[in-house]
Amino acid sequence: MEPFQSNWQTGVTEQRPELFLLSGKEWSDGISAGFTGRRGGISKAPYDSFNLAYHVEDQPEDVLENRRLLCQQLGFDPKGWVCGEQVHSNHIACVTAEDSGKGWADRASAFQDTDGLITNVPGILLTSFYADCVPLYFIDPVRRVVGLAHAGWKGTVADIAGEMIRTMERQYGSQAADLRAAIGPSIGMGQYEVDERVMEHVDVWTGRLEGNGQVPTYAKSGAPGKTWLDLKQLNRELMIFAGIQPQHIEVSQWCTHERHDLFFSYRADGGRTGRMASWAGIETE
């Protein structure tokens, strides 16, 4: 079953944008987590219409209103919004109550050089932004900790998935065996062709990850020197390598490139487009 379920059937409007809600008991028991679509919101083309990121050339006031609409729909106070200035790294920030609002109104106030966020504070809404890259979600249902990570190919081969797990263990006392994880909508292997330069970094992991899963991490394409890369599966294998049980990982089948009617896609939209947001937060009582 697809873990990210659209709220489209409940009616999507400018004021009530489309959300893809992460389902499952662990993700619904006082935890809000999911992924935004591109429908709804107020941004104009080519960012139409639910763009959540400032770093594209969208009007800042439209982005801010879209963020307000998301918080309103989720029931989170905008003052609890937190995001990072993503740089395709494996850098992670542990978010406290004092960090509330970082990145809400501008890029300068966000966590700089950061692609992973973790918190155990109710009312904090962790967010990160995408247009083909892979959103990673983590929850420790025992210690009530949530985390998000942004994984492009650079962050993936830098093992941001493993770094998230190790940081949760080190900073929050989590145990990998307790963790649940999800991999959200992103570009699928059949649409993500990379060159030998990228595969040199991927191949460093290949031998170490053998036997983790039954789905190949990548397969050769017909073009010389090119490979179709499955970033979702590679991140899944990295999670397993770091200690998460395979049955505790859910993987979305949504491909942002194939369904760029529903999602922003950097490759399908020619590079000039908006960004979806992943989110995760512990709800206040």
Predicted regions and their residues:
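Active-site microenvironment for binding and transforming phosphate-containing groups
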Residues: 1-285
